[in-house]
Amino acid sequence: MAKPAARPRKKIKKTVVDGIAHIHASFNNTIVTITDRQGNALSWATSGGSGFRGSRKSTPFAAQIAAERAGQAALEYGLKNLDVNVKGPGPGRESAVRALNSCGYKIASITDVTPIPHNGCRPPKKRRV
């Protein structure tokens, strides 16, 4: 006998007050992920996913747009306070933090979590233009 069709349950949005914004700024792209305190992703955005391709992905303006998109999406969860972790040497570091600040978040701390090798892998060769 056929089972009756299960009614789709409404997805319950959890409310999160404190979160962490992880900004990964590489030379080619900027990735902004906003998580709760446990590390569960609430929203994310990238420069490439925001409509920038090629060398325009690595600009501070592209990082600003990506941070604004991730910040606006995370506002639906009731997020108010952010700790910011910045990783990488890219050009979008400061502009992404400024964009999150302009979204209305109260930024409690900014931490640089760029991994520094203890003489690990050989770095890429210098460019000759």
Curated annotation (Swiss-Prot):
GO terms assigned for molecular function: rRNA binding; structural constituent of ribosome
Keyword 4Fe-4S: no
This protein's UniProt keywords: Ribonucleoprotein, Ribosomal protein, RNA-binding, rRNA-binding
Any one Gene Ontology cellular component term annotated for this protein: ribosome
PANTHER family: 40S RIBOSOMAL PROTEIN S14/30S RIBOSOMAL PROTEIN S11
NCBIfam families named among the record's database cross-references: PRK05309.1, uS11_bact
Role played: Located on the platform of the 30S subunit, it bridges several disparate RNA helices of the 16S rRNA. Forms part of the Shine-Dalgarno cleft in the 70S ribosome.
Name of the protein this chain belongs to: Small ribosomal subunit protein uS11
Organism of provenance: Pseudomonas putida (strain GB-1)
Upper classification of the organism: Bacteria, Pseudomonadati, Pseudomonadota, Gammaproteobacteria, Pseudomonadales
Name of the gene encoding the protein in the UniProt record: rpsK
